[in-house]
Amino acid sequence: MSEFDRLTDPATMKGLSFEEQTYEVSRRLAALTRRRFLAGSGALLATAGAAMPAFAQRKGGNLRIGRSSDPDTLDPQKTTSFTSHETFTQIFDGMVMRDEKGNVLPHLALSWEFQNDNKRVVFKLRPDVVFHDGTPLNAEAVAFTVKRHLDPATASPTKFICGPLTHAEVIDDLTIAYVYSAPFVTLWVGLGGAYQAILSPAAVQKLGNDFGRNPVGSGPFKFEKWQPDSGIKLVRNDKHMFINKRFKNDKPAHLDSIEYVVIPEDAPRLAALQSNEIQVIAGFNAVPLDKLAQVKRMRNVKLMQRTALSCFGLCFNTKLTPTSDLKVRQALSMAIDKNKVMQLALGGNGELAYSPLGPAFPQVLPNAKELAPKYDPAKAKALLQEAGATNLKLRLSTGDDGANRRACEVIQAELKAVGVEVAIEAVPGAEAAVIGRKGEHPLYMLNYRYTDGDVLHILLHKTGALNRGFYTDPRTDDLLDKQRLEFDPKKRDAMINEVQKIAIEQCWWLPLYADVTAVAIRDTVQDFENAWDARIYYKDVWLKA
């Protein structure tokens, strides 16, 4: 255990309140800072509440980012993890990017042309791009990446993002065609994210299954090392010189390096920010939403927040008894006060949801609230009696981050009030995903972030990668397939609305709330953007004196 881990270990602070833990860790880290300084280590770290300069110039420096958990892998084709995506977004480049209005921005692809009734897209690639291992990023590399993503042997959980993509065809060294079996209106959602980023063929072939622990891309930062349950270090890629409208900087990143530091517990993580052991807390659930008031009171710390394109909800497993019964699903939905869940899980920092499509999505069903089951414990008890579902004992699987744990504890108490006993199984996010895919529990806490209503295909289609309720409904599948082919926005939105109506009527989900994307940064951190799509890029970030 490192000195930092030892000083922030919650086991040494048993019996202390959250605020007392934060203070105690701040005190310890301040003492550590003084010892480092007196020992001549050169680590000029500001003590809690002080405004001591961290770095003296725009170029250079190491940025330390606090997070709650480790990724499961850094192979973009082998995970759906938010934490992984946050990391390999820095390491890899995608074909395009998108702005807040949905406009498609050139990135690796400088231009594109739709052909063959929108079933073929020809991309012109940026010249002179190389991977971190020195090999060229050309059409062959793109074709290799696509082939691997689609290969059943890869068993990619993000293959669904590719839609009806069948293969990529090399035209010349800098021209590549993506060939689809049908028009695919949401292709930019995937191509604009890191799950479809371009991989180094040489590195994949050399490393095999170890590629996810030693990723090689072409992005603004290169992978250097990974110490499990401790942190990941990336260093600047001095050959990343290109720009699009999401980047201000057309030269290599300002920072020498960035480190992701794993601090599982909220109080030590906030204390590390207060004492300048870390300069940023960012990423999924990294800033505890029930503690935003405390973060706002921190000196020399800036809190950035915005409503997320997200939804947190309780999935009912329709292949298991008793949640295969619609009356039971309705009863469980009516027994839970989702406002109470949001207040205690997020400190009220969210927006209630009534559809599996989160409230911040433009395509959310306008009358979802009117159609959704109302909180009514008495009616919930009556429905359980009608269904013959008495003395129920159910297992609820969830990731072990603070917000999800708190939400599940409220759900547990609410269901106990109507005679349902719930055993919570809280495990690290990667393990929870495995449990969810196996479908061994009747209840599963699920959340997502996405940028388009096509997320319903992922959640509710029989082939959906996040269909944790194992729903199978031919009409829903047909609508979800057709909306992917419909280029008329009004017609497509009508299909997405119809799917939401079915999902609400069938109680496949109990939508709870959308959270906010919250980031806390030291005031030395400049040009940091809390982006609309929750994708954080560190290429523009710099540290001031």
Which residues does each predicted region cover?
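Structural transition elements
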Residues: 221, 351-386, 403-406
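Alpha-helical secondary-structure segments
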Residues: 138-147, 173-179, 219-220, 252-257, ...
